[in-house]
Amino acid sequence: MKLVLAIVVILMLLSLSTGAEMSDNHASRSATARRDRHLSPKAWPCGGVRASCSRHDDCCGSLCCFGTSTGCRVAVRPCW
């Protein structure tokens, strides 16, 4: 009888700890989704070729910013 009671208590504790981990993971996922939504292309649009830019992050993909007058361009080397 004591053995059965001990097993039941252990299983209850395991289910409680697993439930806490699942809720923590859910909170982490929702925070990640919120961050991704704020950093989505709609929130931070990038520019294509000849788009106005002031830094490399303003240009899409492998394009680099060559100043406000030149804009985003394809570079032979990685952006510096």
UniProtKB/Swiss-Prot annotation:
GO MF terms, alphabetically ordered: ion channel inhibitor activity; toxin activity
Record propeptide residues: 20-42
Disulfide bond annotation, renumbered to this chain: 46-60, 53-65, 59-72, 64-79
Major localisation: secreted
Tissue specificity statement from the Swiss-Prot or TrEMBL entry: Expressed by the venom duct.
Database matches in InterPro entries: Conotoxin
Recorded GO CC terms: extracellular region
Keyword annotations from UniProtKB, A to Z: Disulfide bond, Secreted, Signal, Toxin
Compartments in which it is found: Secreted
Position of the signal peptide: 1-19
Family: Belongs to the conotoxin I3 superfamily.
Domain-level remarks: The cysteine framework is XI (C-C-CC-CC-C-C).
Name assigned to this protein: Conotoxin Ca11a
Organism: Conus caracteristicus
